[in-house]
A protein has these predicted regions:
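Alpha-helical transmembrane segments and immediately membrane-proximal extracytoplasmic
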Residues: 3-302
Length: 302
C-alpha cells in the first residue's frame, strides 16, 4: 500500500511538473510571437520616418521607398553580424533590468504596453521611437513587479546600461540638428557655383545613399532591441532549467533570433506607414533633395 502511495505521488508530481513546463513553454512562445509582432509594427511605424524625406522630395514613390528601406533594414543584420561582429545593442536591452526581477510576466506586460502605445501613435500619425517605448515598457513592468526601485539591496534597473540610453533620447535631436546644419552649410558652400538643375539631380541620387544609410541604422538599432527582449525571455526560461548564460552566449548559439528579428522589421517596413510619412515629410516642414540628404545623413550618423 505504501509503495502504491509513493507511486501515486510520483505520478502526480511528474504530471504537474510536466504540465507546468508545458505552460511555461507556451507562454514563452507567445512572448516570442508578440516580440516579433512588435518588431513588425516597428517596421511600418518607425521606418516611415526613414523614407519620409525621400518620398516628399519625389525621389522615390512610397512603394519604391518602403522596398528600398526594407532591403537595408535587413542588410543591417549582415553589418552587425559580420562587420561589427556582435549585437551590443541587444545586450544592453537584455541587461537593462537586473536578472532577479525578470520574469516572463514582466516581459509580456512590457510588450503589451509597447505595442498598444505604438498602435496609438501610428493611428494618430505621431512620430515616436518604438524601440525606446519597448525599453520603457520592459523597465516599467519590472518596477511594478518588484513594487519598489530596489529589493534586498539590488536595484531593479541596471542604471549603468539605461542612463546613457535615456540621455541620448534627449541629446539625439539636438546632435542631429547640429550635424544637419553643418552638412547643409558645407554642401551649400561647395556647390555654390553649380547649376541648380544639375545640383538638384546630384542631390536626388545622393538621397538614395543617405536614406539607405538611415535604414541601415534603423534596422541595426531597432531589430536588436527586439532581440534583447527575446533573449531576456529565453535566458529566463533556460535559468528555470538550471542553465545560466549571458545574452551574447545565447545569441551566438541561436542565430534564428537575429534572423527572425531583422526579417520581421523588414516585412513591417514593406507594409508602409503612410500616415507618418505624410507627417514627417510634409506637415513638419517641406524639404528639398539637399535638405533630405542632410537630414538623412545626420540621422544616420546620430
Amino acid at each position: 500500500l505504501d509503495e502504491l502511495k509513493h507511486l501515486f505521488y510520483f505520478l502526480v508530481s511528474t504530471f504537474t511538473h510536466s504540465h507546468i513546463s508545458t505552460l511555461v513553454m507556451a507562454f514563452l512562445v507567445i512572448i516570442i510571437i508578440l516580440a516579433l509582432i512588435f518588431d513588425f509594427i516597428n517596421g511600418f511605424h518607425d521606418a516611415a520616418n526613414s523614407i519620409a524625406t525621400i518620398v516628399s522630395t519625389k525621389v522615390l514613390t512610397p512603394f519604391q521607398a518602403v522596398l528600398w528601406a526594407a532591403v537595408f533594414n535587413f542588410a543591417a543584420f549582415f553589418i552587425s553580424r559580420y562587420v561589427i561582429g556582435e549585437f551590443r545593442i541587444g545586450n544592453t536591452i537584455a541587461s537593462s533590468v537586473n536578472k532577479e526581477f525578470i520574469t516572463l510576466g514582466v516581459i509580456f506586460s512590457g510588450l503589451i504596453g509597447a505595442i498598444a502605445w505604438n498602435l496609438l501613435t501610428w493611428w494618430f500619425g505621431i512620430p515616436s521611437s518604438s524601440s525606446h517605448t519597448l525599453l520603457g515598457g520592459f523597465m516599467g513592468a519590472a518596477l511594478a513587479h518588484a513594487g519598489a526601485l530596489s529589493r534586498n539591496g539590488t536595484d531593479v534597473i541596471n542604471y549603468a546600461k539605461v542612463i546613457p540610453t535615456f540621455l541620448f533620447i534627449f541629446l539625439a535631436p539636438v546632435i542631429g540638428m547640429v550635424i544637419g546644419f553643418v552638412i547643409t552649410i558645407t554642401i551649400v558652400n561647395i556647390s555654390r557655383k553649380a547649376h541648380p538643375y544639375k545640383a538638384d539631380n546630384w542631390f536626388r541620387r545622393l538621397q538614395l545613399i543617405s536614406s539607405a544609410l538611415f535604414s541601415l541604422g534603423h534596422g541595426g538599432n531597432d531589430a536588436q532591441k527586439v532581440m534583447g527582449i527575446i533573449g531576456a525571455a529565453m535566458i529566463y526560461y533556460e535559468k528555470t532549467k538550471g542553465h545560466d548564460m549571458t545574452f551574447l552566449q545565447f545569441i551566438n548559439a541561436n542565430m534564428w533570433v537575429p534572423m527572425a528579428s531583422f526579417t520581421a522589421i523588414a516585412f513591417g517596413t514593406m507594409s508602409g506607414g503612410w500616415k507618418i510619412v505624410k507627417t514627417m515629410g510634409t506637415r513638419i516642414t517641406k524639404v528639398t533633395p539637399l535638405e533630405g540628404v542632410s537630414a538623412e545623413t545626420a540621422g544616420a550618423i546620430t
